[in-house]
C-alpha cells in the first residue's frame, strides 16, 4: 500500500483499539504521539470523545464489569496488565539456525514426548520430542496436524496413530499431555501401545516453569516459523491477586508453543541422566548391562 501512496501523496489512515504494548500500533504511538512537525499524526481519545452519542450508562456498566479491559476498549489506553512473555532476544538466542527442522533418533539417547491434543477442529494437534545434551534441552521434533485445505476438521484418531508411531521411533512409550479430554487421550494412545499421562501442571504453569530455561540460555529450538510466532505472541498477565498467567492473545493459538514448552519442562524435570551417572561412577560393564536392560524393556510385550 505505501509504495502506491507515494505516487499520489495519499494518506494512510489506521484506526484501532489499543491493546498490548507491542506491534505496529504501539510503535507508531510511541514514536509519533505528541511530536510537533512529525509527518505521522497520532490521535488518541476515548470512545465518548469521538462519539458523544454513546450512552453514559452503557459505558459505566462496561467499566464496572471489567475496569481493566474498559481502559483499553473505552479510554483508548494501552493495557499495562499484559506484557510479552518472552522477548525476541530470548527466543532468537534459543533457535538453532541451520540445523534440520527435525533431528533423527540416536542410540543411547533418552527422549521425552509431549502432546497438545485436539478434537480435530480449530486448534492444531501437536507433538514435540526432545532430549537433554550437554546441560541443554533440545527440541528434536515438532509436528502439528491441521484440517486439510478447504476442510474444517481432521481425524484425531488417525493423527494419534501417526504421532504414536513417531514417538516409538524415539523409544517414547509414554507421553505427557494437557487436560484436554484426558480419558479419550488415554484410550486413544493406549490403542497404539503408548501410555498417555496427564500433566500435573496447567499450560500456564508450564510456560512459567520454562521461563528460567530461556533466560539461562539452555534451550535449543528448531527454526520453526509457527512455533516462533506463537512464542512471540504469548501474553503474560498479572491478575489482581498478584498471580501471573500466560496464554495466547485474543483469537490466537499456542498449540506448537504448548507442545514445545511441555517437552522442555518434562526434560528439565527429569534432568538427572542415569547413563551419565553410571558412566561417571560405575564400571563400563555396568553401563553395558544397564543399556541392555533398557533395550530389553523396550522390546518387551508390555512396552510395544
Question: Model-predicted segments: where are they?
Answer:
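Substrate-gating cap/lid alpha-helix
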Residues: 210-213
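Short, conserved "post-DEAD/DEAH" coupling segment immediately C-terminal to helicase motif II
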Residues: 1-10
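RNase H-like, metal-dependent nuclease domains and their acidic two-metal-ion catalytic environment used
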Residues: 9-41, 52-204, 208, 221-304
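Conserved AAA+ ATPase "SRH/arginine-finger" region at the nucleotide-binding site
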Residues: 44-50
Amino acid at each position: 500500500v505505501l509504495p502506491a501512496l507515494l505516487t499520489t501523496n495519499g494518506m494512510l489512515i489506521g484506526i484501532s483499539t489499543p491493546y498490548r504494548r507491542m506491534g505496529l500500533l504501539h510503535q507508531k504511538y510511541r514514536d509519533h504521539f505528541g511530536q510537533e512537525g512529525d509527518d505521522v499524526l497520532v490521535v488518541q481519545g476515548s470512545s465518548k470523545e469521538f462519539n458523544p452519542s454513546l450512552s453514559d450508562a452503557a459505558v459505566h456498566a462496561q467499566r464496572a464489569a471489567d475496569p481493566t479491559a474498559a481502559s483499553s476498549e473505552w479510554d483508548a489506553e494501552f493495557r499495562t496488565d499484559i506484557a510479552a512473555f518472552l522477548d525476541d532476544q530470548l527466543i532468537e538466542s534459543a533457535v538453532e539456525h541451520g540445523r534440520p527442522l527435525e533431528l533423527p533418533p540416536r542410540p543411547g539417547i533418552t527422549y521425552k514426548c509431549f502432546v497438545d491434543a485436539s478434537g480435530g477442529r480449530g486448534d492444531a494437534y501437536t507433538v514435540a520430542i526432545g532430549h537433554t545434551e550437554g546441560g541443554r534441552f533440545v527440541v528434536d521434533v515438532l509436528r502439528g496436524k491441521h484440517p486439510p485445505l478447504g476442510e474444517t476438521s481432521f481425524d484425531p484418531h488417525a493423527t494419534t496413530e501417526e504421532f504414536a508411531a513417531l514417538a516409538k521411533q524415539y523409544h517414547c512409550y509414554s507421553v505427557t499431555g494437557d487436560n484436554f479430554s484426558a480419558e479419550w487421550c488415554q484410550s486413544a494412545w493406549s490403542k497404539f501401545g503408548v501410555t498417555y499421562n496427564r500433566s500435573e501442571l496447567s499450560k500456564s504453569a508450564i510456560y512459567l516453569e520454562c521461563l528460567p530455561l530461556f533466560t539461562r540460555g539452555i534451550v535449543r529450538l528448531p527454526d520453526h516459523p509457527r512455533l516462533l510466532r506463537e512464542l512471540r505472541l504469548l501474553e503474560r498477565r498479572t491478575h489482581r491477586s498478584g498471580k501471573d498467567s500466560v496464554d495466547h492473545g485474543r483469537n490466537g493459538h499456542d498449540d506448537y508453543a504448548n507442545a514445545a514448552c511441555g517437552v522442555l519442562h518434562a526434560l528439565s524435570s527429569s534432568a538427572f541422566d542415569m547413563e551419565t551417572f553410571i558412566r561417571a561412577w560405575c564400571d563400563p560393564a555396568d553401563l553395558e548391562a544397564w543399556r541392555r536392560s533398557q533395550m530389553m524393556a523396550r522390546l518387551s510385550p508390555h512396552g510395544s
